[in-house]
Amino acid sequence: MIMPTASELIRHHHAHPLDFESVREVPDSHAWPDLHDHPTASAQGAVVPVIDLSATATNVLEQLARACESWGAFQVTGHGVPPGLLRRVEAAARGVFALPTNRKLEAARPADGVSGYGRARISCFFPKLMWSEGFTIAGSPVDHARTLWPDDDALAFCDVIEEYKEEMKQLARKLMRMMLMSLGLTEAEAEAETETGWIGPGDEAGGMSAVLQLNSYPVCPDPDRAMGMAAHTDSTLLTLLFQSNTSGLQVLQVVGDTGRDRAARWVTVPPMPGALIVNVGDLFQILSNGRYRSVIHRAVVNRTSHRVSVAYMCGPPAASKVEPIVKLVGPGSGPVYRPVTWPEYLSVKGKLFDKALASVMRTEVSLEHT
């Protein structure tokens, strides 16, 4: 599934990752001075919601609304993705990152491309580098797979990736419908949005676009000085994340009202066997007219376990405008955000990063918030 024109718009930092196996200490280039910008909640404290999608529909919709309004993220069980497929896609990801560095660099992401091996694209927004490496798959994985492995191994890798992408596509469409219904749309209205509206069946000519991102967080000799993935929001509708059995994902929970009582803390999302994590993306925040907020999240590293994660990042067709759903715009208040395409928003995010959402607010709304 190809995201048209995105390769022309995503031109972020593309330098090669560090050869992590060759270093015994964190170099200054990767030493972060502000890892503790917010406190981290204790393991017995706040918990990111877990939602069983096989439960009663009404109950699930209520839970989705609370999770999206309060957290912008949640874990799902009862999603129907075979556990064996999750194990195989984790093994496929580990197989990529276990290759020698010189082999991985043969599949390096070009400066003007989307797919391939390299650093996180958000690297250019930070003065320090991250303790991670990534492999992005937009469209078919065949070309890069043949660069990395002999034909039989490449075919096996591609089979797993394509099967996983298909499962994620179906789950993403299901979640989109349910989340729209949790906002107050009827089943017919949600169905119209996901089947006949701009979120269509999901082929190249129309429907949801998607990119699959494999992430690697190698063992770190000094995790208190390194950052796996810096804090950010996703430029998507939804991101479906499989984080295997090693913790590292943290989401930022804002507690209290505005003013002095307002505070934020990092909450670790514990791995759950077979569960998937759902992040609300920037585009869904626009779609919901700001009711559901995209979640700020990051990844921390550890000194004992090599962590991998697999993120399915989905959005609308490149030519489709994303704007607040009319039914969600209150009388007399107007939409908070102006219409924007996914490529247009990626271009804005590539320049403004964490100020991108504010930049697509309507002028009169922006003035009210200044």
Name every feature range the model reports, one short phrase each.
Residues M1-T370:
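Peripheral, non-catalytic segments flanking oxidoreductase cores
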